[in-house]
């Protein structure tokens, strides 16, 4: 890290510290924490009330129902009333509260035009080009920097369901993960003629046979190899313009792919002036605190440090593709 970047980081951190120390922000944080905690409690109380009512009714019939109603009024109604006071007519779950109300303002301290939102606006068709074949795709939490390359990243979970029947004729359903990681979208510095897909492939240890769940060669595509033997073993390249593809796959880009082989499955799709990159990391960025204890520990400074580290990683990961 250069001295200039280090000074910039220190200035950012100091702005965050001053913001967190202000009485206005402390009040906002107190309300946000209370909203998130009451969302958790309300969900738990509703489940407990339903289960308790069923059990009491089964044991005591009408009397059990009356007991459940009394307990609900004593313990559940105050929580419901406070929830109505906090949210009024506006319904916000903890994902919205954490991502859009808590993290997004931090992003704006780093990138004034940046934002975070719960629902991504990535188009599904190009996303499928950089992910294994699947039937269900769930994207969440998009970070958009709105910088010169229009860099955005979202979490993605893709899966399919397998049904099986045992010897007794009982059917079970199992959810199989196809992809769990991040998808990046950015503007490619130059317009790309046609398109190129670079996707990972695995080989069995004995037969060296390709085992690939990513979409194979499509209509009008060519499959090409490079002079990098290691790259050919781990990646398949499909394109519609071989000249443009080979110009893109210069030694720097091939080295970047080789580096990422050991870290995660990485795929690229470029069409016209837009690039999509996927990383199968096995985790999601910006997970929402799921317990009351974690919510109580929310700190603007600490969340800034984690967010800044993620943004630095994202920028470093995509740096070679920027103009």
Name every feature range the model reports, one short phrase each:
Residues 1-42:
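Cytosolic juxtamembrane N-terminal segments of multi-pass membrane proteins
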Residues 36-40, 73-102:
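Transmembrane-cytosolic junction motif
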Residues 37-55:
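Transmembrane alpha-helical segments and their cytosolic interface motifs
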Residues 45, 56-71:
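Hydrophobic alpha-helical transmembrane segments
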Residues 51-54, 70-77:
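Alpha-helical transmembrane segments
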Residues 82-94, 112, 163-174:
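Intrinsically disordered, low-complexity coil segments
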Residues 100, 104, 108-162, 170-323:
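Charged, low-complexity intrinsically disordered regions
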């Amino acid at each position: 890290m250069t001295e200039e970047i280090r000074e910039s980081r220190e200035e950012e951190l100091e702005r965050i510290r001053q913001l967190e120390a202000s009485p206005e922000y402390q009040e906002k944080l107190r309300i946000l924490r209370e909203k998130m905690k009451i969302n958790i409690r309300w969900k738990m109380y509703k489940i407990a009330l339903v289960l308790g009512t069923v059990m009491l009714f089964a044991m005591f019939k009408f009397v059990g129902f009356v007991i459940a109603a009394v307990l609900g009024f004593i313990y559940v109604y105050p929580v419901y009333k406070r929830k109505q006071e906090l949210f009024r007519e506006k319904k916000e779950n903890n994902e919205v509260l954490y991502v859009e109300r808590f993290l997004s303002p931090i992003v704006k301290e780093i990138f004034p035009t940046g934002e975070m939102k719960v629902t991504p606006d990535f188009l599904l068709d190009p996303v499928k080009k950089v992910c294994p074949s699947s039937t269900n795709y769930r994207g969440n939490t998009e970070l958009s920097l709105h910088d010169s390359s229009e860099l955005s990243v979202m979490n993605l979970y893709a899966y399919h369901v397998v049904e099986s029947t045992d010897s007794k004729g009982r059917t079970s359903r199992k959810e199989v993960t196809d992809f769990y990681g991040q998808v990046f979208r950015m503007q490619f510095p130059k317009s790309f003629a046609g398109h190129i897909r670079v996707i990972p492939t695995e080989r069995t240890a004995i037969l060296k046979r390709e085992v690939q769940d990513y979409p194979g060669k499509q209509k009008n595509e060519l499959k090409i190899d490079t002079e990098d033997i290691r790259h050919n073993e781990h990646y398949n390249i499909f394109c519609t313009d071989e000249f443009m593809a080979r110009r893109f796959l210069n030694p720097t880009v091939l080295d970047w792919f080789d580096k990422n082989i050991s870290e995660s499955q990485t795929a690229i799709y470029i069409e016209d002036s837009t690039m999509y990159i996927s990383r199968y990391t096995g985790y999601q960025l910006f997970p929402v605190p799921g317990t009351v204890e974690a919510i109580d520990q929310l700190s603007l400074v600490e969340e800034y440090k984690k967010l800044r580290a993620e943004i630095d990683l994202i920028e470093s990961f995509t740096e070679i593709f920027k103009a």
